[in-house]
């Protein structure tokens, strides 16, 4: 059985109007239309109006979620996914936090299996809180960029931190290593890679 052409979610929803305002449609409906790239929002409005317009069309699935409020996905414009487990550690000052927590934790990402598992876990966390895109930093290890771009669902630009100075010996890169990493990842990912 093929997927319906239209899926209509009957629910409340938040509709952003600008960067400072949104409207809350309490008894609304959002119409998703099937495309070659999956379902995309096709129309939205008051539930009564939408149902009157689409109910007679062929290939419609109505999904009633009266106690649900849908909202758009979130975009986080700057985060270091490889610092997730230390982000809540005490931060009296940045340098102590980096030395005591962040750098030792990021060093663990040299292990590809560790990096892959953490990327899968963090991808689940992103979806659970509704984050569907953003600008992300990985560790100095190129595979941490690979893992983020493989597992994160949505529109992400990922870059790795470049640590050629003022870092612990176990995380320092030579300028040559950093340039090699940039060339490899930018060639592989194009616009999805950030420097």
Indicate where each model-derived feature is located.
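N-terminal metal-binding scaffold of metallo-dependent hydrolase/deaminase domains
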Residues: 1-56
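A cross-domain feature marking catalytic cores of carbohydrate-active enzymes
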Residues: 79, 137-138, 158-162
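Active-site gating loops and adjacent loop-to-helix segments of metal-dependent hydrolytic enzymes
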Residues: 85-115, 166-167
């Amino acid at each position: 059985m093929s997927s319906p052409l239209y899926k209509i979610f009957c629910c409340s929803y938040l509709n952003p109007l600008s960067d400072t305002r949104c409207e809350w449609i309490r008894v609304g409906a959002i119409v998703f239309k099937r495309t070659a790239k999956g379902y995309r929002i096709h129309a939205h409005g008051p539930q009564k109006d939408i149902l009157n317009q689409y109910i007679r069309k062929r290939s419609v699935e109505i999904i009633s979620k009266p106690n649900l409020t849908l909202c758009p996905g979130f975009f986080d414009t700057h985060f270091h996914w490889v610092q997730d487990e230390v982000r809540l550690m005490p931060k009296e000052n940045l340098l102590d936090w980096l030395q005591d927590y962040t750098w030792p934790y990021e060093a663990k990402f040299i292990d590809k299996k560790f990096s892959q598992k953490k990327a899968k876990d963090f991808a689940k966390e992103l979806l659970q809180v509704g984050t569907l895109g953003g600008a992300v930093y990985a560790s100095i290890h190129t595979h941490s960029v690979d893992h983020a771009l493989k597992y994160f669902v949505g529109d992400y630009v990922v870059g790795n931190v470049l640590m050629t100075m003022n870092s612990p010996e176990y995380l320092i890169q030579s300028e040559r290593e950093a340039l090699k990493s940039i060339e490899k990842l930018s060639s592989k990912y194009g616009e999805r890679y950030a420097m």
